[in-house]
Design a protein with these regions (language model features):
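Alpha/beta-hydrolase fold catalytic core
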Residues: 4-65, 88-90, 128-129, 319-320
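Conserved alpha/beta-hydrolase catalytic His-Asp/Glu region
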Residues: 195-261, 265
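Short glycine-enriched nucleophile-adjacent loop
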Residues: 140-151, 157
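Flexible "cap/lid" loop of the alpha/beta hydrolase fold
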Residues: 148, 157-197
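Conserved loop-alpha-helix segment in the C-terminal half of the alpha/beta-hydrolase fold
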Residues: 262-299
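Catalytic histidine-centered segment of alpha/beta-hydrolase-like enzymes
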Residues: 299-312
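Active-site loop/oxyanion-hole signature of alpha/beta-hydrolase fold enzymes
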Residues: 94-134, 138
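Conserved HGGG/HGGXW glycine-rich cap/lid loop of the alpha/beta-hydrolase fold
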Residues: 51, 57-102
Length: 320
């Protein structure tokens, strides 16, 4: 399942951007664009763990950090149907991971360790107090690890479709090949023509639409031209291929078997009925090791967007 996910997302990124390398230190002096998420009133760039990170914030109340999952064209825009409702009761923060959307992108290997470090640094440097986290997919895995390692930083976890339970990085294979977590494979994508071989296979707009129709949304009508445009905009600019290259090479995987049972914070799981990559059957792995409340919504990969009103109601009831 993880291999299929990487393959599909790599296809999309290769038809949507070129792997032009412009290495160097991040520039935090750039003026931030206006916030695009409803309810957010400010935006800024901040340097965290050596990377330039774009974030938005708004609202008043106890802090809530919303963290997007990993995928070509992903960003904090995935929470556009949630931020307004939550900002009426909480101080809401949302950032783009390094390598994605408005955050800086460099010609480097991105890793799960880096992204966990970015979350920790954001809480310590920007929020500056313990925070409640809403996270999806891989970001949920990172949040679980951080909540276990640094429990004083995180008070509650509302997690959608996490993906890291049962991962064995030593034995995973990619289409029957070598171990999935493979820095050498990243170098093949980044430094040789292999990374652009699939570029002409799909038209970028149609390729993204295919992915949205069949893997992201259960109701394909929600994959509007405006949504497609946002994904395309998020892929504009140099070095936007390197985070997906890292993903495809297994460098962003985060096993959580050792972390999940040790969590001391209140946790609420939300799962889509028809998620292709993280099927609903996987929820039993989590509940067997640590029983927590579960909400199932009619959706694929992003129940917080497809069923946003129901998700927002769950969030407002769970968060403190």
């Amino acid at each position: 399942m993880q291999s299929m996910k990487r393959f599909l997302l790599l296809l999309l990124v290769l038809v949507s951007c070129t792997p032009l390398a412009t290495p160097g230190r991040p520039d935090s002096s750039q003026t931030a664009p206006a916030p695009r998420l409803p309810g957010m009133t400010s935006s800024a760039f901040v340097e965290l763990a050596g990377e330039r990170v774009y974030f938005e914030s708004g609202g008043t109340g106890t802090p809530v950090l919303m963290i997007h999952g990993i995928g070509a064209g992903n960003s904090s825009h995935l929470y556009r149907n949630n931020t307004l409702a939550l900002s009426k009761a909480h101080r809401v923060y949302a950032f783009d991971f390094p390598g994605f959307a408005r955050s800086g992108a460099r010609a480097i290997q991105y890793t799960n360790d880096l992204y966990v470090a970015v979350i920790e640094a954001f809480i310590r440097s920007v929020v500056r107090e313990p925070v409640q986290i809403i996270a999806s997919s891989y970001a949920a895995d990172y949040a679980i690890r951080l909540a276990s390692e640094q429990p004083q930083l995180i008070t509650r976890l509302l997690l959608s479709n996490p993906s890291g339970y049962g991962l064995d990085l030593d034995s995973m294979t990619l289409f029957g090949g070598n171990a999935s977590r493979n820095p050498e494979r990243f170098k093949q994508f980044a430094d040789t023509p292999l990374g652009t071989l699939i570029f002409p296979v799909l038209n970028s707009e149609s390729g993204i639409n295919f992915f949205l129709y069949y893997y992201v949304y259960l109701d394909w009508r929600k994959a509007t031209p405006e949504v497609t445009r946002i994904y395309l905009e998020n892929l504009e600019g140099p070095n936007k291929a390197y985070a997906p290259f890292s993903f495809f090479s297994g460098l962003l995987d985060q096993p959580i078997d050792a972390y999940w049972p040790t969590l001391t914070q209140p946790v609420h799981l939300v799962w889509g009925t028809d998620d292709v990559f993280n099927p609903i059957t996987e929820v039993s792995l989590y509940l067997e090791k640590r029983p927590v409340p579960l909400t199932i919504l009619r959706a694929r990969a992003i129940p917080y967007e497809e069923e946003s009103e129901k998700f927002n109601a769950v969030a407002l009831k769970f968060l403190r």
